[in-house]
Amino acid sequence: MKSMILPRLTVLIVTLNNARTLQTCLKAIAAQDYPKNLIELLNVDGGSTDETLNILKRFGFRSVHSTIPGNAEAQRGIGLKLAKNNLIVSLDADNYLPTDQWFREMVQPFIDDPTMVHANTLHYRHDYRDTVYNRYCALFGVVDPIVFYIGRPDRLAQYQKSWTLGNVVKETSAYVSVDFDLGTLPTVGCNGVVYRRDLLLKHANSAPEQFLHIDVFADLVAKGFTRFAIVKNDVTHDTAVSLPALMKKRIAFLSGYYLKNTLKRRYLIHNPQKITDQIKLLLFILYTVTLIKPLIDSAVGFYYIRDPAWFLHPVICWIYLYAYGAASIKKLKLRLFS
């Protein structure tokens, strides 16, 4: 690939007290084999009080204080509006790029196909040296096991090598081109992805107050912008949370972003109007309560990759069942007593 045909990029990172992971994230960005004059470094910060902003400054990022503090989704919407370039590399502060070719690999689908909307990695990176929960997420390809069982993950489990969701229209040695509809669109838009700014601004409900990183791409799919790429590489997601912290974080996330009446969802991981989704949700509850299916899935994964982190799966299923249940009860109470 010649540098003269490489597109300009805006690297967008949203932050809130991310000093623990940020330096590792930014070092990997700085090491990319990509012309520096083609890269804008943009940060939208939600009110950090640790060393986050100083670290960003050292690495050459332009930091903007969010007008909607403490809301990562709104920060993404603000960054979308402020970006100078059309291709946005969206990274969280706990995402680490595994090689210096990552930018080049991720933009290739956009160079090859002018209708391309979004590109994400095939896997999360698995590293035996990582924490057990990070390894679990990388092994199963999801943070949320409900997504795994309903069948809408945006990454594959480590033992899965072929992408089958949606309508596969082209496969190369480097990536898969897929057309999605609203029934097959996975949970895209976050943790190491590249997407087009122009389409989101013109055709999606991308105002910061309403921005949700999956829903804006559902807006595009609904309007006929259906071409997505699954790039055959990976990205590290360093969640590094304890299991109690995970439960607390997930309840807050669901209550804040996904169960509020003020946010009209255009994308539903579980659509209560669809019988198939209802059945899959009931099966997830049954699987979690009985433990049998999660243990079988753990054993299958362990057969391919000998990492005991697979067997965290039954525990994570219980945590998420509790988190969704607690958030749903909280929403019901608000309806009844507000």
Name each model feature, range by range.
Residues 27-38:
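Short, acidic, metal-binding catalytic loop of nucleotide-sugar glycosyltransferases
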Residues 1-28:
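N-proximal low-complexity "stem/linker" segments adjacent to membrane-targeting elements
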Residues 251-255, 269-338:
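Non-catalytic, C-terminal membrane-associated alpha-helical segments of glycosyltransferases
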